[in-house]
Regions:
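Small beta-barrel nucleic-acid-binding modules, primarily SNase/OB-fold domains
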Residues: 2-13, 18-173
Length: 173
C-alpha cells in the first residue's frame, strides 16, 4: 500500500513537470492586433488567436497620458511581424501572460521599458535588468518619463475604480 502511494506520487510529479515544460515551450506566431501597450493578439500557426499580456511590464492604460503612445510603440515593434513567445501563466482576465521575443531575440517588455513606455512590473518580476532600464529611461526623460508626475497604471486603475464605486446621489429622496 505504501509503495503504491509512493509510485502514484512520482507519477503525479512527473505529469506536473511534463505539463510545466509544455506550458513554457516556445510558440511561433504573428501579431495581428495591438490592444494596448502591454496586450497584443497573436495568430498561432494553427490559425487560432490568443490574447497575450506582456510579462514583467505595465504600460499606461489607453485612457491615461502616454497610453496611446505606448500602444503605438508596441505596434511599431511587432504588429504584423513574426514572434516567438513563452506562456508564463494566465491573468485574472484569462489572458496568457507571455514573454515575447522578436527580431533576433529582442525581448518586447525590455524594449518598451527602455523606450520609456512602461514600468517594470516588479510585483511579478525578479528581472533586475528591467529595473535598470526603467531607471535609465527616467534619467533620460524618455517616453512617459517626460512627465515628472507620471502615474503608474496600477495607481491609475485604483483611483479609477474608487471613483466608479462612489456614485453621486441624484433626484429626490
Amino acid at each position: 500500500m505504501v509503495i503504491e502511494g509512493v509510485v502514484m506520487r512520482k507519477i503525479i510529479y512527473l505529469v506536473l513537470i511534463f505539463n510545466s515544460v509544455l506550458f513554457l515551450s516556445q510558440i511561433r506566431a504573428k501579431i495581428i492586433a495591438i490592444k494596448d501597450g502591454d496586450t497584443v493578439v497573436a495568430l498561432l500557426e494553427n490559425k487560432q488567436q490568443e490574447t497575450l499580456r506582456l510579462a514583467e511590464v505595465d504600460c499606461p492604460e489607453n485612457s491615461q497620458p502616454f497610453g496611446k503612445s505606448a500602444k503605438q510603440f508596441t505596434s511599431s515593434q511587432v504588429f504584423g511581424r513574426p514572434i516567438i513567445f513563452y506562456r508564463i501563466n494566465k491573468d485574472r482576465y484569462r489572458r496568457t501572460i507571455a514573454k515575447i521575443f522578436y527580431e533576433n531575440e529582442k525581448y518586447l517588455s525590455a524594449e518598451i521599458i527602455k523606450a520609456g513606455f512602461g514600468w517594470w512590473y516588479y510585483k511579478a518580476s525578479k528581472n533586475i535588468q528591467l529595473k535598470e532600464y526603467e531607471n535609465s529611461a527616467r534619467k533620460k526623460k524618455l517616453g512617459l518619463w517626460k512627465d515628472k508626475n507620471a502615474i503608474s497604471p496600477w495607481e491609475f486603475r485604483k483611483v479609477k475604480n474608487t471613483h466608479q464605486k462612489i456614485k453621486p446621489i441624484t433626484g429626490k429622496r
